[in-house]
C-alpha cells in the first residue's frame, strides 16, 4: 500500500455513483476482504455523523424555488398564444397538444434543474436537499413535486392531460389540480402494482429459459469472436459504453499494433488493458461472448468472462444462467416510476435551443436553408448542412454554427433580443426510437356545412368511402347553419305576397323515427322517446298517429304537426313525406271523426297523375288481432302502377292496391305470436288450450283454440285458431275441402245432425302427423264496403272552391291481397280498408305537358288569424339561378297575377297593415318573361339581423321613400340585404323594387362611376330573424341569425379603402379571425363573405380547421355536419415512451419476439452489405449453413442492443453478458425445412443449431434448416427436460407427449433436480466429476479440426468479422 504522504486528498461530495466506482476500484486493487473492511469503516463513520447531525424534516424546510413565478407565467403566456393560433386555424390539434406538453415539460424540467443549485446556494444543509441528493430517501423528481411544480399528469388511458398542475405539494392544490392529481396518482398506484406483477412474471420466464446454464469447462476451444469497434461506420460509440462492453471479457484473438502484440488470445480485459487499447487507438477488438461458446447446454469460463461479484474469471460450477435471468428481471421490480411526466406523448425528443447571447440582427445565407413547418406548426427554415449564423449588435459580431437538420426559427435580417431562441437542434439524428402510429380524431364543434379548399384530393381514398386524403397543408371550413327538414317542400312554389313560415318543417335530426316493420307486418312501430314518455307502451295506437286535416274554418298552426315529438313519419321509400295535422278547434259534427285523414306529399313535393293525395282510415275497418283476409274470386282492378304507388304500411314488396268492385270481404281472425328460436314453449303442437293459458314464460293466450307451432328460420311462429273442431265421417262433404268459405244457410249434411248456419264460416282441414285428420271450423268477420264516403263527407264544400282543373276522386283500397296474412305488432291495430283521394288534373292544351305538379304548405296570416293551406301549383316551377340562353338580355320581372290559383288569399291590404309576426317573411314571386321559370324572394320586415352596426353609418331616407311608392310590404329601417334573386341586367329600371335589396349577387366591386358588375352565385333567402335559407336543391341548410356578422363600410372612406388596400372582397371568400377587412377595425370572427354591398359586407360565420398533409378528411364537400361528427383524422408518429412502465412491455416484446411495427433506420446499408457478402458465401461449401449462421449472429446482436437501449434509457446498467445468455437460448434452435435429413430429423422439427451442424458433419450430408427466433415462453417449452417444461406451463400436454414419445430426462438442469428433490448440479463445490476440465485434450482436438477445416473456418471467421462491421448497430445502443 502506498505511503500516506503520497495520497491525494479529494475534498468532494461523494454521491451514489462515485461510491460505486470507488468500491469497484478498491476490489480491483485490494481484493474482497480488504474492501469490506474499508466499507465497514465508512458505514461506522456515516452512522456517527447521522447521529451527530440528527436531521429532522419540517414544513419550513420545503423552500419554493424563487424563479418559479416568472417561469410559470411565461409558460402560461406561451399557452395562451398557442390557444389563439389554434383558434385562428394556424395550428391543428396535434401540434397544439404537442407544443403545450413540451412547454410545460420544459418548464417543469427547468425548475427541477434549478432546485439543487438553489438549495446549494441558499441552504446547503437543508434536510430535504441532503436526503434527496444523497439518495438516502426520495429522489430529485419527488422533491421537485414538493417544492417545484407537480407538472403534467396522465389520465387512466395513458394519454396526457394537457392542463399541468402548476402548484407544488407545499403550496397546496386547487380543486381542478387536485382532481387531475388524483388521476395521475391513481395511475401511479395501478402502474406500480401492474409493474411489480409483470416484472415478477418476466423474471420467472427468464430464469426458466436459462436455469440449466452452468459453467462446466474452462475453455470450449472456440476460435470465433465478435468484434467491437469504438468507431463504427454509422456513428461513434460512446467511450463509457465501449469500456463497459470490454471490461471483464476475454479476447478471442491476439491484438497487434504494427508488428507488436499488445494483448494475446484468452487474456481477460481489465480496466488498465482497456485504457491502453483505447490509447493505442485499436480499430476493432475481437472478444469471446456466450454467443461464441461451442457448448449446447452449458458455458465455459473464457466465453463468460469475469464474475461480476469478485472481478476474477468466473468459477467452475457457477449457475450463471439464473444470475442472468435475475439481473434482467430485477430492475423492473426495483425501479421507481421514473419520468412518467409525459405519459408517452414524447420522450426526451425535446430539442436543444440555441439562444441569442445579446440583442442584435441576424444574418445567414438564405440559399442554404429551405422553408418548412416544425412539428409544432411554426414556420421555420431547415438547414441541410452546417450553417453559420451571425448576430450583429452595435459593437460585437457573434457567430454561431448550426448543425445539419436543425430548424432556424428566425428570418434573415430579423432583430432578435437577448436570450431569444433562434434555432432548435434536434437530438442525435441516428438515435432510433420505437415509433408508434397514433390516430387523433378532430370533431366538429358546431353544426354546419363542410367546405374544403381546392387542395383536397376529391377522389376518396377507397371507392365506396367518404375519406379523402390531403396532399398539402390547408384549411377545412365548417360554415355555420342548422339543417332544415326539407327545403324542397318549403320552396317549391309560392304565390306572390304569400306570407310563409320559414322554420316550417325543421326537425331535429335524431327524432326522425325509424320504422321497424318486417315484411307483411302492418303497423308501424315508432321508437320515439317522446311517445314513450306519454304512453306506457312505446307504440301508440293508429288513430293517434294519423294526423288530421282539420275542417271547420281550417285554423292550423304549424306546431300542431307533432311538434313536441318532432316525428315526421318517414317512409321506407325515401321519396315521400307524410305530414299529419291536428286541428285547434272542435270539428263540426256532420263530418267523419278526425281520426284518420292524412295528407301524403312526396318528399320532393312533386305529384304525378293519379297519385294519392290524401287518405282516410275508417275506424270501422280496423282490427286489433291478426288474421287472414279473403275475398275469394271477386274481381279486382289494379288501377295504379307500382312505381307511382307507395305502400303506406312499410311492406317491403310494393304491391298494387286493389279497387273493389264488390262490396264485401272477409276477415278470419287468429292469434299469432312470433317467438325467438330459443323460446321455451309451454304448449304442444295441435293441442287445445283455453283463454289466458301460459304459452311461454311471459306470454299468455288471449283466445282459446287449437295450437299450431311452425319453426322457421331463426324464429318460431305460434298460431292459435279459435273455432269448433269437427271429426267428420266418410260421407261428410265438408271434409273434402280445405280453406273454403261457406256462406250462411248451407248446413252440414251429416247423418247425426243437420243445422243451418247463421254466419259465414271458414273450413280448414288439419292432419296432425300419424293421426286421423279433422276439420277446424273457424268464425269469419264479414265487412261491407260502403259507397257513401265521398268528398262532401270528408271535407266541407268550400274547401276546393277553386279547383277549376284539379280533380279529386275517392277510392277504397283493400290493403292486403287475397289470402294474405295480416300481422299486428303489440298493441297496434290493423287497417284493412283505406279510403284514398286520388289527384288528377285537366288535360287541356295549355297544361297537357304537365305530367307532374308541385305541392306545398302555405301559412297565411290575416288580421291576426293564421291559416294553413295546401297548394298544388300547375305552373312549371324551376327556380332559376342562371339566365337561360334564349332570354333576352333585358328580361325583367312580370307580375304573377295571371297565374292559375288554387285558392284565394285574403286581401293584400290586410297583410300589409298587420304587424308581421317575428318568424315570418313575405315572399315576392317573379315570373320571367318567357313564363317558363319562376323565382322567389323572401323579404323581411324587421332589422333584428343588423348585428352591431358601426355607429357612424347614416341611413338614407331615399331608400324608404322609394319603397313606399309601391307599398309591397311594411319594411322598417333595414339597411341589410333582404334576399337574393336571379340575374339582373337592367338594374336601374327596377329601382323601386330593388333599392333596399342591393342585390347580393355582386361578385366584386368596381367603383367606376358607380357602375356595378353583377355575377351570379348561389342564392340565399334571408328571413327577418336573420336566418338565411340556402336555395340549393340538394342541401337543406338554415343559417343561424346570431352567427351572421355585418360590417358596414362608410361610403366616405370606401374609395380610400379600395385604393389603399387594393383588396377586392369577393363573394365566397374565406377570412380567418383577426384579418383586417375594413381599414379601421380588424374582422373579429372567421367566416365566408356572403353578401357584398355598397356600405356593408355580410359574413357567414365559419370555423377553420387546419389539416396537414396525410390527414384524412371525412365527409364530402358541402355535406351537412352535426356537432360531434368526425371531421379529420390525423395520423402522426410519436416516440413510444421510455418510461419503465412502457419500457417493461418493450423488453418483454423483444424477448417474446413479438412483431414491432418500426423498421430500422439503417436497413438500406445492411442490405447493401448483404449484397457484397453474398457472392463470397455462394462459393463456399456449406454456404447455407453460413447464411443461417450470419442471420443468427445478426439477430442476436440486434436483440441485445434493443434490450440494452430500454434499460439504458432508464439509467439502469446491466452487463451485456447477462442479456447475451438469454438471447443465446432463444436463438439457439433451427427449424428443419426439407426432407434432406428425413432419416435423422423430421421436417418442421426444432433442433439445436450446434446439434444440426454436428449431425451434418458426421453424416457428411447437407441439412436444410432455417433460423427461428423463439420467444422465452416457447424456448422454455422446447428444452431437453420434460420435467422442467411440465413444471412451467401446460403440464398435462407436456407429460402426455413425453410419455407417448418415451422421452428420457437426464436431469442435467437445476429445476428438474429441485422438482425431484435431488442435489442441484451447480455450485463451486459441486462434485468435480461433472465438470469437464480436460483442457489439453480440447486443444489437441482443436488443432486437428483446424487442419481439416481451415478453409471453412478461416473464411467463415472473416465473413463473420466483416459482417459484424456493417450490421452491428453497435452494442452501445
Curated annotation (Swiss-Prot):
Q: Does the keyword Plastid apply?
A: yes
Cofactor(s) for this UniProt protein: Zn(2+)
Q: What is its EC number?
A: 2.7.7.6
Identify the Pfam families for this entry: RNA_pol_Rpb1_4, RNA_pol_Rpb1_5
> What reaction(s) does this enzyme catalyze?
RNA(n) + a ribonucleoside 5'-triphosphate = RNA(n+1) + diphosphate
Which GO cellular component terms are attached?
A: chloroplast; DNA-directed RNA polymerase complex; mitochondrion
Q: How is the cofactor bound?
A: Binds 1 Zn(2+) ion per subunit.
Q: What is its subcellular localisation?
A: Plastid, Chloroplast
Q: Which CDD domains match?
A: RNAP_beta'_C
Q: Which residues bind Zn(2+)?
A: 220, 293, 300, 303
Sequence similarity: Belongs to the RNA polymerase beta' chain family. RpoC2 subfamily.
Q: How does it assemble?
A: In plastids the minimal PEP RNA polymerase catalytic core is composed of four subunits: alpha, beta, beta', and beta''. When a (nuclear-encoded) sigma factor is associated with the core the holoenzyme is formed, which can initiate transcription.
Q: Which HAMAP family match?
A: RNApol_bact_RpoC2
Q: What is this protein called?
A: DNA-directed RNA polymerase subunit beta''
Q: Which organism is it from?
A: Lepidium virginicum
What gene name is given for the protein in this entry? rpoC2
